[in-house]
């Protein structure tokens, strides 16, 4: 892994969290914009497979990501994945999409699901468990997100997305 940012701040944070980052590469960056640019440039040059945002504003990373010179757009829908760990859970949670897509159509929701599964598979070797959430367990007309969840599950099954998918 490569960490990008203020080396002293990175080292202090790792120490405070009791994390051993001695095998990590650390690239100095002067500020958030520089960190985002360095990450996108590294991805453009195939020196990284995934950009994982830490203590960096999403809008700053997205501005860099969208710059044409980095050539990172591949025609797929962009989506946001939040990686969450807690002491109570033995496995991390990946939550999508909480930051980029507002009121997505069903086809966009399916693409967001595909993005999340593809991301997960870059980090893990086993089949992910996916929960498509809504405010109710069964699809009902008065809650469109529940009907959308059912449709996304059906489409995911047809497309044979390699994940255990349940919901709403």
Residues covered by each model-derived region:
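Anion-binding alpha/beta catalytic cores of soluble intermediary-metabolism enzymes, centered on
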Residues: 1-168
